[in-house]
């Protein structure tokens, strides 16, 4: 697989505006099947970082990631109400890909867009929440790094 989305890092090219690529989309869609679920860091109520795996993480649009949180009472949802800044890490050694996404999260109310997030989530995640009792979270991506170098950033 070509590493086109890391062009800026490998070539020394300029940082570009956030535009989540086809390669990023494919990597995140296959992450759970490949045993490399996305790790998400958020800030707990005491101000400390905490981390969790989110196998439902996927590209929602060119500037947004989405997560389906199966448990509507999950601590993650409570944390992002207080502080919506997140970091999400994707690492796949076999693909030789690493992406660190930084952004801000918002919880969607139930409705059409929330249903879209559920339907676009990994089938295994849907099977664990067949009643769709969870909540959809959108992450506006502000910065993408790969191998320690910023490759995409919003103005």
Regions found by a protein language model. Name each.
Residues 2-155:
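Binding-site signature for planar aromatic cofactors or substrates
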């Amino acid at each position: 697989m070509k590493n086109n989305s890391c062009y800026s890092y490998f070539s020394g090219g300029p940082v570009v505006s956030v535009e989540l690529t086809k390669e990023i989309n494919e990597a995140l869609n296959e992450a759970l099947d490949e045993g490399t679920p996305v790790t998400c860091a958020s800030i707990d109520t005491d101000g400390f970082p905490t981390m969790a795996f989110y196998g439902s993480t996927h590209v929602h649009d060119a500037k947004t990631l989405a997560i389906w949180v199966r448990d509507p009472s999950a601590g993650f949802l409570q944390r992002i109400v207080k502080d919506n800044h997140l970091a999400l890490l994707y690492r796949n050694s076999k693909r030789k890909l690493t992406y660190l996404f930084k952004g801000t999260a918002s919880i969607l109310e139930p409705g059409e867009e929330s249903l879209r997030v559920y339907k676009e989530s990994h089938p295994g995640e849907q099977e664990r929440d067949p009643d769709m009792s969870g909540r959809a979270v959108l992450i506006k991506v502000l910065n993408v790094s790969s191998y320690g170098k910023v490759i995409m950033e919003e103005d």
